[in-house]
Amino acid sequence: MKKWMLAICLMFINEICQATDCFDLAGRDYKIDPDLLRAISWKESRYRVNAIGINPVTGYGSGLMQVDSQHFNELARYGIKPEHLTTDPCMNIYTGAYYLAIAFKKWGVTWEAVGAYNAGFRKSERQNQRRLAYASEVYRIYTGIKSSKGIRLPATKKSLPEINSVQNN
């Protein structure tokens, strides 16, 4: 029984270690702070590689970054299948970074774009509120990650700091 549990623990640790490297690699390749990707992943899945989350509007999210099923047809053109997103941590992280980079390209490197990763780009008061709530939660997680590395960021409830100034820390 102990050997069986040890094997499961080692597999889990191996997946987490691989995923950690992938946050750094995807961050480098997409010019996104890897800690921001980590914060989004924690918010989306609590770092669970095989997480599936129900989205009442578009279907469901898959894996660490909760890549939404609405993107599956586009991803299929690149050979990415839905099952890859829950079994390959690196592919999931890179895919999430890709969609965050699209949001940054569309709206600039802003917390509103981070919010759009989850709540989309539709312009309405409700969507604006959802984007702000999501971005605020990601920012809270992000500051925790930075704090654990000895980096202090402004803690604010009124407005989020400029993302470029935060990423440079």
Curated annotation (Swiss-Prot):
It holds the Pfam family SLT. InterPro entries: Lysozyme-like_dom_sf, Transglycosylase_SLT_dom_1. Signal peptide: none annotated. Keywords: Plasmid. CDD domains: LT_IagB-like (cd13400). Belongs to the IagB/IpgF/P19 family. This is X polypeptide. It comes from Escherichia coli. The gene is X.
